[in-house]
């Protein structure tokens, strides 16, 4: 009888603990993730004007990207939320999304990406919901200003982003 108690206890313990081992498992298990709709990632950065792209990456059109800084600390909260999220306008690079003008980020790093530098249409789409900004330029004057800013910009390095503000 005592010889059967140990295996029975082991099987009982195994049955109780064979659930999902990840900290933020969705309801219904890991395979139910594909059924969930993606939500927008948490706001971050100064004034909440950015969006989280990873546990230590916060990017916004007006801000650029913060990688591994205090502005990106809020992004660690995404690890504890049960549903997946997605930030950025369009896909770029290898599994990344356009985070700011000319910057492509995935959940681990950011790189400069020419395909994320669409010009005025990118900025206008990203800010279309921001009606509180009375200085938003549209039309020919906005296009001219954007072109001047692009011409004044220095060539960007093709190396991966290092921790800091970009």
Curated annotation (Swiss-Prot):
Gene Ontology CC terms: extracellular space; secretory granule
Signal peptide: 1-19
Residues recorded with modification Glycine amide: 28
InterPro entries: Neurhyp_horm (IPR000981), Neurhyp_horm_dom_sf (IPR036387), Neurohypophysial_hormone_CS (IPR022423)
Site annotation Important for agonist activity on V1aR/AVPR1A: residues: 28
PTM field: A shorter neurophysin molecule (32-123) is called neurophysin-I and is derived from the complete protein (called neurophysin III) by proteolytic degradation (in vivo or after extraction).
Protein name: Vasopressin-neurophysin 2-copeptin
Source organism of this protein record: Sus scrofa (Pig)
Gene: AVP
């Amino acid at each position: 009888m005592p010889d059967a108690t140990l295996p029975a206890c082991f099987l009982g313990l195994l049955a109780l603990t064979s659930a999902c081992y990840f900290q933020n498992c969705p309801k219904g298990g890991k395979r139910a993730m594909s059924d969930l709709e993606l939500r927008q990632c948490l706001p971050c950065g100064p004034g909440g004007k950015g969006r989280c792209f990873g546990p230590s990456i916060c990017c916004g059109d007006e801000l650029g990207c913060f990688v591994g800084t205090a502005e990106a600390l809020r992004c660690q909260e995404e690890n504890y939320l049960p549903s997946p999220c997605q930030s950025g306008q369009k896909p770029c690079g290898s599994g990344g999304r356009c985070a700011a003008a000319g910057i492509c980020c995935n959940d681990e790093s950011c790189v400069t990406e020419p395909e994320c530098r669409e010009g005025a249409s990118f900025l206008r789409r990203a800010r279309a919901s921001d009606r509180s900004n009375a200085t938003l330029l549209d039309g020919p004057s906005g296009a001219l200003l954007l072109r001047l800013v692009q011409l004044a910009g220095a060539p960007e390095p093709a190396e991966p982003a290092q921790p800091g503000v970009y």
